[in-house]
Amino acid sequence: MSGSSLPGALALSLLLVSGSLLPGPGAAQNAGFVKSPMSETKLTGDAFELYCDVVGSPTPEIQWWYAEVNRAESFRQLWDGARKRRVTVNTAYGSNGVSVLRITRLTLEDSGTYECRASNDPKRNDLRQNPSITWIRAQATISVLQKPRIVTSEEVIIRDSLLPVTLQCNLTSSSHTLMYSYWTKNGVELTATRKNASNMEYRINKPRAEDSGEYHCVYHFVSAPKANATIEVKAAPDITGHKRSENKNEGQDAMMYCKSVGYPHPEWMWRKKENGVFEEISNSSGRFFIINKENYTELNIVNLQITEDPGEYECNATNSIGSASVSTVLRVRSHLAPLWPFLGILAEIIILVVIIVVYEKRKRPDEVPDAGPMKTNSTNNHKDKNLRQRNTN
């Protein structure tokens, strides 16, 4: 072997050796965490969720374990439906493994250390193996504190009366220092309500359906999670927006909608007037599509038929307090309708031309037939002149 070929052969050998050490597409890969659970502090009655995301080849198995406070070595496995069905475990496996642990209606006994374990070791469930070697772990500490006691006024139902309404909250007991408090409606903070007070009031001077919803008095503390209480203000639906009429051409699509205020959110229903009576729409043709979103509903009709779809449509909103209905008139024109203005103009032009032609024919005088040249007085005068000249001679 020549000296020049020796380094090349050596490099090729090293490349083959190093290539054999690199993991291929189907090579095994140890489990590793992409996302680990995070520690939280909660109040009794609240809920928490812990997330765990792991990778590896093959996809690692995920388990959840729990240990009480100050007993970190006494872990017990958590199963879906445990603790009187307050525990929910949802796990999905694909290119990686993802699991969510959720516990609701928390009690003080739910405090402790929660552990996400993952492993793709073939012997991971062998009792003779040391779990600390075959499983990787990620821990989170959940601290559950006693929720402060908040006394609230009763729920309110808005009727036709416009008498003022006052909502009240009173923080009667708390082991933590209050920072500030405020009111929210449907999750949005109400302006000019933030203050440092345990007794809170919110006044609605002229209550209407649009004032209904979920009101919360929210308390923030120095070293504890915020606490809140709910007061429901209810009202019958009041439909505030809809189309009075909809004009479309045959073959087009039509969309009718209704918006309402009121709480609780209503159940929506669409009906069409048949023989003077509103009847619920039956989607036998498959051309009707209804979308309901809390205080909004939408009726879509595709490929309008001039013989079936025109008429009066009604949207109805109903909740536990009352109901409301409004109507929309749908008109469907023939697909030739866009040509009607053009045809009308063309007809007017034709009629105008005919009138002009007839008028011109009647206005023209009768034509005189040709009768040859006519004799004039000048000819006679010439004859008379000649006669005089002869007489003189």
From Swiss-Prot:
Isoform 1 and isoform 2 are N-glycosylated. Glycans are attached at residues 170, 196, 228, 283, 295, 316. Disulfide bonds join 52-116, 169-217, 258-315. Its main location: membrane. InterPro entries: Ig-like_dom, Ig-like_dom_sf, Ig-like_fold, Ig_I-set, Ig_sub, Ig_sub2. Residues 149-161 are annotated as: Narpin. It is a single-pass type I membrane protein. Residues 360-393 are cytoplasmic. Interacts with ATP2B1; this interaction stabilizes ATP2B1 and increases ATPase activity; this interaction controls T cell calcium homeostasis following T cell activation. Interacts with XKR8; promoting its localization at the cell membrane. Probable homophilic and heterophilic cell adhesion molecule involved in long term potentiation at hippocampal excitatory synapses through activation of p38MAPK. May also regulate neurite outgrowth by activating the FGFR1 signaling pathway. May play a role in synaptic plasticity. Also acts as a chaperone for ATP2B1; stabilizes ATP2B1 and increases its ATPase activity. Promotes localization of XKR8 at the cell membrane. This is Neuroplastin. It comes from Rattus norvegicus (Rat).
